[in-house]
Amino acid sequence: LAEDMDINIYITDTDSMHIEYDRVKDLTKRFTELYGREMEGKQLGQLHVDFDLDGCHGEISSKKSIYLGKKCYIDIIEGMNDKNEKVVGHHIRMKGVPNSTLYYTADKYTKNVDNNTKLWNMYNRLYHGEKVGFDLLEGGNRCNFKFNGDMTIGYMKEFERVLSFNSEKGQLISVVE
């Protein structure tokens, strides 16, 4: 339906899509007209804006995004707090890498700036073809268990995942600002 309405869809997954915020109401209205039920909501079969930003209770939207591929993206989001002040944050996903590891890795690459900038810089490096290593044990602050063939359980002393995205193979989707 969004495509039929010429709404840009930046990334989709099984139960989500990123579209232009100012077109959400158009899409939900048309959906209701066509199918006789509400599209927007938190029930099964419904969609909703799932950005969450501490201190904001109203509308929250993405101001810029890097989409590396399915389940690998960053949105810099903003909303207004109760004092009508702008609050800026982020919404991140990286399949196979916990959010705490994203923060840990971003902090290694960029110092002395806020988390939004650190994370944006790390995603931007990936967007431009750099390989980034993610220490999934976060320098010993996380534990990952290993189930051995002899029915014993141990823990991993090293666990690094190196990711890269190759634009020549069409893996990269886009940067939207």
Predicted feature residues:
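C-terminal, non-catalytic extensions of nucleic-acid polymerases
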Residues: 1-10, 18-177
